[in-house]
């Protein structure tokens, strides 16, 4: 679609690399991060394979992308890395949040960055915010789009929404 193409062009211009991660995620990876237990993160859709292996449908990709980067970044010279994807997310939402209806399945574009230093991280973050402003300008929403804070239990202080 045209909007996704504009986003893709601006993310690439900012140094992003597009990838696609699996929607089926291993229990072990999320247990290691202490985010598999429903008492900690209660939005998982979980299933079992015939061999009893437990999997979850992706509600986020922090753990899988971190595992991938650990395997492929071999030197600080490889940094910064900005990886993004357009991915179907699945969240077992129980109610609307912040006045906006939350759905159980949606397509989201997310970007993950890996930097050498906090200063470099902040530079990357600023460049991506500028890229989003450019996206909104290009699609004709620049005058009516305002940055907001992506507040929530699983998001870090360096998350933003528009």
Which residue ranges define each predicted feature?
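TRNA-recognition modules of translation machinery and tRNA-sensing kinases, especially anticodon-binding
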Residues: 1-162
């Amino acid at each position: 679609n045209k909007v996704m193409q504009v986003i893709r062009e601006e993310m690439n211009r900012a140094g992003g690399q597009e990838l696609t991660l699996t929607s089926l995620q291993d229990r072990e990876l999320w247990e290691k991060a202490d985010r598999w237990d429903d008492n900690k993160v209660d939005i998982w859709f979980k299933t079992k394979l015939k061999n009893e292996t437990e999997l979850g449908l992706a509600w986020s990709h922090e753990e899988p992308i971190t595992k991938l980067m650990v395997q492929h970044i071999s030197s600080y010279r490889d940094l910064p890395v900005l990886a993004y994807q357009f991915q179907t997310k699945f969240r077992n939402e129980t109610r609307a949040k912040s006045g906006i209806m939350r759905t159980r399945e949606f397509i989201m574009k997310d970007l993950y960055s890996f930097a050498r230093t906090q200063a470099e991280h902040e530079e990357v973050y600023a460049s991506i915010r500028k890229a989003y402003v450019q996206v909104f300008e290009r699609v004709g929403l620049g005058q009516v789009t305002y940055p907001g804070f992506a507040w929530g239990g699983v998001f870090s202080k360096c998350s933003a929404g528009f």
